[in-house]
A protein has these predicted regions:
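Beta-rich carbohydrate-recognition and catalytic domains
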Residues: 1-169, 174-218, 230-279, 303-353, ...
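Beta-rich accessory regions
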Residues: 10-15, 260-491
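Juxtamembrane/interface motifs at transmembrane-helix termini
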Residues: 229-230, 479
Length: 491
């Protein structure tokens, strides 16, 4: 099969991308070149730029045959679109398409993409089923070729009893000695997921190493979108569990969870020591990390979940976006997240209100807008609740409410203009500090990202509220003393 399918996608991009103006996109969150985006893929630093690929249907604002969209950036805020990287145009991926994967640099300077290749195959009972294998493509950062050795991993490379129908999402990296490693997820004989490690000397000939972790039906069923990386002296395994019932902090339906533990590189043994929810908001899935040239561990994710993909503004020309990339660290054995420091370099006009006492709904001069970096610090006190309204006018708002007695922070977009039959609220329990609370809030037209107490928790959601609703207000039940700092963003 020739690459005419890829060229068709590239021609479509060139013809239709001009119909989407910069004003119709977020200011610093990546959206698809055209059409639909879901999982971010191939997040990497290659030849002086950050590369971010993504699951992509260029032809419609809904899921369809999966291609890989492609964009590059030098600062993680401004993204340049490149032509579609790969398309379902080979015998190993000519079914639903080229599913999620990752990227790394090869010894010869080429970039290696590793992805889940899917074909539809007739089963003995006559049923058509999608078979998932892993394939590679090699290129120069713009154009990629699929070698004849594809697929490079199939069911025969898995432990006995693992499913060929659920075997996907390879995350690839290079070891210190140059070895290629990749973690995938697969469905085990007990009907739940496992993280499986493979290795290769050249990136093409792969072999099974070990099962890093099994779910054993504890955290949902099948796992998706694995990542495995060192962080501040520990190792982290991130996965997206499917069909996970609410339990404790794991309550947002499409969780991303992180196991923090110790990894023995000689025996390839990962010992889990604790587990946590990665984001407690409404719209956050399919994480992927990379290491920056300066050593920082950076994370991106899909700012969406599968349960509300039909809720989009009428006439929208694109669908799906990624989060503002985040820096990851460990604090007391748990992951903390902060916006990438590149965002600080975009800070423009600063507005500061210190030690303001609020009770009834309060508007502060110079505080507002839909593109902003806002920090709200609430002093310890005896107030009963505190609320920030974002993207607000007489008809719309998204609300953050903190109850110091239960230590619950609630994100509520029920008045944001979304449909009535999707999830509107999520709550997370934050560290109790006698009412003291710090919220850093990133606004970007269609989204809100909240970093609680310097990133100990985060909450993320899209908000398809009319852009004219740009007010920000503060209120308390009782009296709360707050300091508010807002930076406009020069983007």
């Amino acid at each position: 099969m020739s690459n005419t399918i890829l060229q068709k996608a590239r021609d479509y991009e060139e013809e239709h991308s001009a119909a989407i103006s910069a004003a119709e996109r977020p200011a610093y969150h990546l959206t698809p070149y055209v059409g639909w985006m879901n999982d971010p893929n191939g997040f990497s630093f290659y030849h002086g730029k950050y590369h971010l690929f993504y699951q992509y249907n260029p032809y419609a604002t809904q899921w369809g045959p999966m291609h890989w969209g492609h964009a590059v950036s030098t600062d993680l805020l401004h993204w340049e679109y490149l032509p579609c990287a790969i398309a379902p145009d080979s015998t190993s991926d000519n079914g639903p398409g080229c599913f999620s994967g990752s990227a790394t640099e090869m010894d010869d300077g080429r970039q290696l993409l590793m992805y889940t290749s899917v074909v539809s195959e007739k089963q003995p009972n006559g049923e058509m089923r999608d078979i998932q294998t892993q394939s590679v493509a090699v290129g120069d950062g713009l154009d990629y070729e699929k070698p004849a050795c594809n697929p490079v991993l199939t069911q025969k490379d898995l432990p006995e009893g693992y499913s060929k129908f659920d075997f996907r999402d390879p995350k690839i990296w290079r070891e210190a000695d140059g070895t290629y490693s990749a973690v995938t997820v697969a469905l085990t004989e007990d009907g739940s997921g496992a993280a499986v490690l493979f290795q290769s000397k050249d990136g093409f000939d792969w072999h099974f190493v070990t099962v890093l972790a099994r779910n054993n039906n504890v955290y949902g069923k099948m796992w998706e979108c694995p990542d495995f990386f060192p962080l501040d002296g520990k190792h982290v395994l991130m996965v997206g569990p499917m069909e996970m019932r609410p339990s404790g902090e794991f309550h947002n339906g499409h969780n991303v969870i992180a196991f923090v533990g110790s990894y023995d590189e000689k025996t390839h043994t990962f010992t889990r020591e604790q587990v946590q929810l990665v984001d407690g908001g409404i719209d956050f899935y399919a994480t992927q990390t990379t290491q920056a040239p300066d050593g920082r561990r950076l994370m991106t994710a899909w700012l969406q979940t599968w349960s509300d993909t039909e809720d989009k503004p009428q006439g929208c020309k694109w669908f799906g976006q990624t989060i503002c990339p985040r820096e990851l660290h460990l604090k007391d054995g748990r992951i903390v997240q902060t916006p990438v420091r590149e965002l600080d370099a975009a800070h423009g006009k600063r507005t500061l209100h210190e030690n303001v006492t609020v009770q009834n709904e309060t508007v502060l001069a110079g505080i507002g807008g839909r593109i902003a970096d806002l920090t709200v610090t609430v002093a310890a006190g005896e107030y009963r609740s505190f609320t920030v309204k974002l993207a607000a006018d007489a008809a719309y708002h998204t609300r953050l409410t903190y109850d110091p007695y239960t230590s619950l922070l609630t994100l509520d977009r029920s008045c944001a203009g979304s449909r009535a039959d999707i999830v509107h609220t999520r709550s997370c329990k934050v560290r109790s500090q006698n009412g003291a609370l710090k919220l850093r809030i990133l606004l970007d037209k269609n989204s809100v990202e909240v970093f609680v107490n310097d990133g100990e928790q985060t909450m993320t959601a899209w908000i398809y509220t009319p852009q004219s609703a740009d007010g920000i207000t503060f209120a308390a039940d009782g009296q709360a003393t707050i300091t508010v700092e807002q930076f406009e963003l020069n983007l």
